[in-house]
C-alpha cells in the first residue's frame, strides 16, 4: 500500500514538473517570423493534440485539410507537423523535395526494437540506408527472388487451407488465420525450412507488436522532457525485456546456421545476409554485422505479416459486402485454377479482377493511412511556405484515396475503376501510394502484394463464406481502430464452407 502511494506521489510530482517546465519554455520561446503553412489554432503546450488523441487522425486531418488546404501545419506537442493531403502535393513533397524529407522522425519504440534504428524502416538517411535498400531491391526481395519463393508460398498455403478445412462450419477470425500463415511463410523464406527457434520467434514478435502498437508516444512529442515523460508513461521497459528475449533467439538462429553445412547455401534471406557478412564488404560499401542481420529479420517479420493481414481482411470485407463483386471473384478464381488442388504462383497473373479488387481495397483502406512519417532534413519552401528543418511530414494517403477530384464516387467500392487503367501501386502514381514512394518507399511491395494475392485467391477458390452471427453483408461493422495500422474494430468473423469445386 505504501509503495502504491509512493508511486502515485512520484507520478504527480513528475507531472507537475513536466507541466511547469513546458509552460516556462512556451513563454520564453522566441517568435518565428517565417511563413508556415496554414493550420488550425493551437493551444499552449499541447498544440493540436486535443483534436487528435483518442480520434482517428486520418479522418481528423482530412476534415482540417478541407478547410486549410493540402499543405497544412499543426502542432503535436512540441513537434511542428506538416500534413500533406492531395496527390499533387504528395508529388511535390515526396518526389520534388524527396531528399529534403528522406529522414524518419526519432522514435523511442523503434530505437528499442530496431537495434537503435538499424534496418530500412527507421535508419537515418545516408550511405548505410542507400546500400541496405539496394540489398533489399536487388537480392532479398527482387522480382526473381520473390518468384523463387513460390514453392514455399504454395506449401504453406496447403497447410493454411487444411487448417480451415478442419474447421468448416465453425466461426473463425480470418485475420488470426492469415497472421499464422504469414508468420510461417516469412520465417521459411528468411530462415529456411529448418529453424528450431521458429515458434519462439513468432511468439516474441506477437508480443512486441502488441506493446509497440500505439501510433504516438508522448515522449516523442515532447523531446525536451523525454526523460521525465518516459518514467511516467512509457512501456519501453517491457519492450527492452522482449528485445532481450528476441536477441537471444536470433543469436541461436544465426549461430546454428553459421555452424552448419547449410551456411554455404543462399536460397533464403539469412543465407544471403551471412554471405555479405563473410565478405566483410569487399564487394560492397555495406558492412553487415550480426546486429544488422537481427534488425533486418525482425523488421521483415513484422512488416510482411501484420500489414499484409490488415489489407487482406479489408479486401475480404469489401468483397463480401458486394455480392456482384463476390460472384465475379469466385468465377475468375475458380476458372483460373479449375481442377487444381492448390493455388499456383504461375497463374496468379491471370486474376485481373482480383487484382482490381485489391487495388480498390488499398485505395479505401490502406494499412497505414498516414504512410510512415518523414522528417525534414533541412529547411525548404513550397508555394511560399517554409517547411522548418526537423518538422515531421505526414502524408494523409487515406485522404488522397478519397479525393473526389481524382476518384468519382470516392467512398464507393468499385473495382471497375481500375479496368484498362495503368495505375499501379509501385510509387509512380501518386493517387495510389498505399506502400509509400521514393527514397523511403517500401522495398518489399512486390513481396507483400504477392503474399496478399496468394491468400485471397486461396480463400475464394477453396471456400464459400458466410458471416457468423446471422448478420447480412450490409450489417458488417466497418468501424476502424487506429494503432500500428488501421484495422477493423471488430475482426471479420466468418463461417467457411467447402466450395463445390
Swiss-Prot record:
Cellular localization per UniProt: Membrane
Pathway: Alkaloid biosynthesis
Annotated EC: 1.14.14.187, 1.14.19.80
UniProt key word rRNA-binding: no
Membrane-spanning residues: 4-24
Keywords: Alkaloid metabolism, Glycoprotein, Heme, Iron, Membrane, Metal-binding, Monooxygenase, Oxidoreductase, Transmembrane, Transmembrane helix
Cofactor(s) of this protein: heme
Known catalytic reactions: (19E)-geissoschizine + reduced [NADPH--hemoprotein reductase] + O2 = rhazimal + oxidized [NADPH--hemoprotein reductase] + 2 H2O + H(+); (19E)-geissoschizine + reduced [NADPH--hemoprotein reductase] + O2 = akuammicine + formate + oxidized [NADPH--hemoprotein reductase] + H2O + H(+)
Temperature dependence: Optimum temperature is 32-37 degrees Celsius.
Any one of the GO CC terms: membrane
Topology versus the membrane: Single-pass membrane protein
Class of the enzyme per the UniProt entry, highest EC level: oxidoreductase
Regions annotated as coiled coil: none
pH dependence as annotated: Optimum pH is 7-8.
Glycan attachment residues as annotated in the record: 282
Pfam family, one: p450
Residues where heme binds: 442
Documented effect of changing residue 212 to A: Reduced activity
An example molecular function term from Gene Ontology annotations: heme binding
Gene3D superfamilies linked to this entry: Cytochrome P450 (1.10.630.10)
InterPro entries recorded: Cyt_P450 (IPR001128), Cyt_P450_CS (IPR017972), Cyt_P450_E_grp-I (IPR002401), Cyt_P450_sf (IPR036396)
PANTHER family for this protein: CYTOCHROME P450 71D11-LIKE, CYTOCHROME P450 FAMILY 71 PROTEIN
Function per UniProt: A cytochrome P450 monooxygenase involved in the biosynthesis of akuammilan monoterpene indole alkaloids (MIAs) natural products, components with various biological properties such as antidiabetic, antibacterial, anti-inflammatory, anticancer, and antimalarial activities. Catalyzes the conversion of geissoschizine to rhazimal. Can also, with lower efficiency, support the conversion of geissoschizine to akuammicine.
Protein name, as recorded: Rhazimal synthase
Source species taxonomy: Eukaryota, Viridiplantae, Streptophyta, Embryophyta, Tracheophyta
Gene coding for it: RHS
Amino acid at each position: 500500500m505504501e509503495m502504491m502511494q509512493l508511486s502515485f506521489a512520484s507520478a504527480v510530482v513528475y507531472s507537475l514538473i513536466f507541466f511547469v517546465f513546458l509552460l516556462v519554455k512556451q513563454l520564453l520561446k522566441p517568435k518565428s517570423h517565417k511563413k508556415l503553412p496554414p493550420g488550425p489554432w493551437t493551444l499552449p503546450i499541447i498544440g493540436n493534440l486535443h483534436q487528435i488523441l483518442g480520434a482517428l487522425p486520418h479522418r481528423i486531418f482530412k476534415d482540417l485539410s478541407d478547410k486549410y488546404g493540402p499543405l497544412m501545419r499543426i502542432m503535436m506537442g512540441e513537434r511542428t507537423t506538416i500534413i500533406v493531403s492531395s496527390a499533387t502535393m504528395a508529388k511535390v513533397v515526396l518526389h520534388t523535395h524527396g531528399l529534403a524529407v528522406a529522414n524518419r522522425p526519432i522514435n523511442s519504440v523503434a530505437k528499442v526494437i530496431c537495434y537503435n534504428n538499424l534496418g530500412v524502416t527507421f535508419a537515418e538517411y545516408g550511405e548505410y540506408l542507400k546500400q541496405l535498400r539496394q540489398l533489399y531491391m536487388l537480392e532479398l526481395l527482387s522480382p526473381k527472388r520473390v518468384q523463387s519463393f513460390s514453392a514455399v508460398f504454395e506449401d504453406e498455403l496447403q497447410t493454411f487451407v487444411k487448417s480451415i478445412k478442419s474447421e468448416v462450419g465453425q466461426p473463425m477470425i480470418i485475420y488470426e488465420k492469415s497472421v499464422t500463415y504469414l508468420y510461417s511463410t516469412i520465417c521459411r523464406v528468411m530462415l529456411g525450412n529448418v529453424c528450431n527457434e521458429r515458434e519462439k520467434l513468432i511468439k516474441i514478435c506477437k508480443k512486441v507488436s502488441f506493446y509497440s502498437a500505439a501510433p504516438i508516444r508522448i515522449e516523442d512529442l515532447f523531446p525536451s522532457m523525454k526523460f521525465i515523460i518516459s518514467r511516467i508513461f512509457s512501456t519501453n521497459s517491457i519492450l527492452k525485456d522482449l528485445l532481450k528475449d528476441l536477441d537471444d533467439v536470433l543469436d541461436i538462429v544465426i549461430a546454428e546456421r553459421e555452424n552448419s553445412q547449410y551456411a554455404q547455401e543462399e536460397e533464403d534471406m539469412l543465407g544471403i545476409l551471412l554471405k555479405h557478412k563473410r565478405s566483410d564488404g569487399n564487394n560492397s560499401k555495406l558492412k553487415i554485422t550480426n546486429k544488422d542481420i537481427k534488425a533486418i529479420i525482425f523488421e521483415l517479420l513484422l512488416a510482411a505479416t501484420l500489414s499484409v493481414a490488415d489489407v487482406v481482411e479489408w479486401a475480404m470485407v469489401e468483397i463480401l459486402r458486394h455480392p456482384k463483386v463476390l460472384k465475379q471473384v469466385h468465377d475468375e478464381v475458380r476458372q483460373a485454377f479449375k481442377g487444381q488442388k492448390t493455388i499456383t504462383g504461375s497463374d496468379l497473373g491471370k486474376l485481373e479482377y482480383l487484382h482490381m479488387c485489391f487495388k480498390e481495397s488499398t485505395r479505401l483502406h490502406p494499412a497505414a493511412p498516414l504512410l510512415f512519417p518523414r522528417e525534414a532534413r533541412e529547411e525548404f519552401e513550397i508555394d511560399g511556405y517554409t517547411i522548418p528543418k526537423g518538422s515531421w511530414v505526414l502524408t494523409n494517403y487515406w485522404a488522397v484515396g478519397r479525393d473526389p477530384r481524382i476518384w468519382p464516387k470516392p467512398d464507393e467500392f468499385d473495382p471497375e475503376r481500375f479496368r484498362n487503367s495503368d495505375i499501379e501501386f509501385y510509387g509512380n502514381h501518386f493517387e495510389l501510394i498505399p506502400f509509400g514512394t521514393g527514397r523511403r518507399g517500401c522495398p518489399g511491395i512486390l513481396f507483400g502484394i504477392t503474399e496478399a494475392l496468394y491468400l485471397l485467391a486461396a480463400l475464394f477458390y477453396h471456400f464459400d463464406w458466410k458471416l457468423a452471427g446471422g448478420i447480412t453483408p450490409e450489417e458488417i461493422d466497418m468501424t476502424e481502430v487506429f494503432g500500428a495500422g488501421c484495422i477493423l474494430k471488430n475482426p471479420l468473423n466468418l463461417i467457411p464452407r467447402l466450395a463445390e469445386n
